[in-house]
Amino acid sequence: MNTNHRRIKINVSWKWGLFFFLMSVAFSSCIDDFDVKKLQDTPRLVLYCFPTEGDTTLIVVTKSLPVSSFKGDIDTQSRLPVDASVVYKVNGMPQEVKRIENIKEAQSFSQVSDSWFLSTLIGQYYAVGKQKAGDKIEVQVSADGLSEVSASTSIPEKVDVNIGDIHLKEKSSDHDVYFSVDKLEATFSDPASTTDYYSVKVTRKQKYGNLKGVPKEGNRWQYDVYANNYQDYLNYLGREDEYEWCFDSLASNIVWPEMVTTSEPLINKKSELDDDFGFDEYKYFDDVYIFNDRTINGQTYTMHLEVNSNDSYWHTYDGWDRLFGFTYNVQLCKVTPEYYRFLKSINDAQSNSWADAGLMQVTPTYSNVKGGFGVVAGFNVCEASKYIAPLPSAPSDNQGGIYTK
């Protein structure tokens, strides 16, 4: 499956909906995740929609293809949009639904300029209308020759999250992990009156690219120079009388570092039984870590999150974080039960080494779409960030730093 979208930067109001559009594309050809018996009859509509607070909601409509009789490139054909009538309601009131007509319009949904990525958006739909936490969302889709489908969800209240201490380049709590980790504390308060579902993700924003040096007036070397990495920049130090450094020539990038789950009980799914049989540990799709409040209901709880240090500032993107620092971001997403069940079914399927060995049945991907496939599921995200100033020099593997509240 194509997961090259993992580092795409997306406009805030659509970023999670667009992320799940890409996820639906990635899974559109993975027929083992669905009920194969249903896929063997006539084509059915496939609907994906992930409403949240804001004024624009992406609606993805494709169709399933009968695996027993279809001839051709099923992977490509299953990604194509469908000419359909789409009704989107907020608290029973229909909202305006538009269609993405061209690359230029698709570009408004993303800062990504990749033509293939943008082409996957053409022909899809989006609803325009303000919506907030507590709103009920209904989606109905009909198309010629296909049965009508419908689904409903709601937008949950967001839960605030705060970043506490951050410890850099420490030994992981998992004895099987050979790399150093950065340890983050993230605190939130779970509502006591409801059963709640969440996802958490850690990202890191950092500089990358070539640093441009422009000759000062009178410099006999009349051409620009470029520091390709932090070491190159150090080599130019001492020549400040010759060059002006254009620090805005560097771009910012967002990465999703690998997370070690054993330090946090809410997301730790590592099984000693799996270890005994040599099976892989639990896999979270696209580094979105889901959990529920069964063990923490009504509590103010601090998550202890570990991410791979070696994905980051001392090795990745040429070491510019030694000069500029970087920013950690924690995204805590309050999700609806259908959102949680959908992601959990994907995680369970891709983590089921017992099924791969023929010892257990594969569970189909969850769907709440009546008459078809896919999912309509609401969410609400809260983010917290903490800037990490550059250390004077690169620490060794047993030398780290702590950034307090």
Task: Please provide the spans of the model-predicted regions.
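C-terminal motif of bacterial Sec signal peptides marking the signal peptidase cleavage site
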Residues: 26-29
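N-terminal secretory signal peptides that target proteins for export/translocation
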Residues: 1-12
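Sec-dependent signal peptide recognition
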Residues: 13-20
